[in-house]
């Protein structure tokens, strides 16, 4: 389940960096 948390953070970072 910890991996899921990491994926969520990476997803948010990707969205922010895409802007």
Swiss-Prot record:
The keyword Membrane does not apply. Its main location: periplasm. Keywords: Bacterial flagellum, Periplasm. Coiled coil: none annotated. Transmembrane segments: none annotated. GO terms for cellular component: periplasmic flagellum. It is found in: Periplasmic flagellum; Periplasm. The keyword Magnesium does not apply. The flagellum consists of an outer layer composed of repeating units of FlaA around a core that contains one or all of five antigenically related polypeptides. Belongs to the bacterial flagellin family. This is Flagellar filament 32 kDa core protein.
């Amino acid at each position: 389940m910890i991996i899921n948390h990491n994926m969520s953070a990476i997803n948010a970072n990707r969205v922010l960096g895409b802007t």
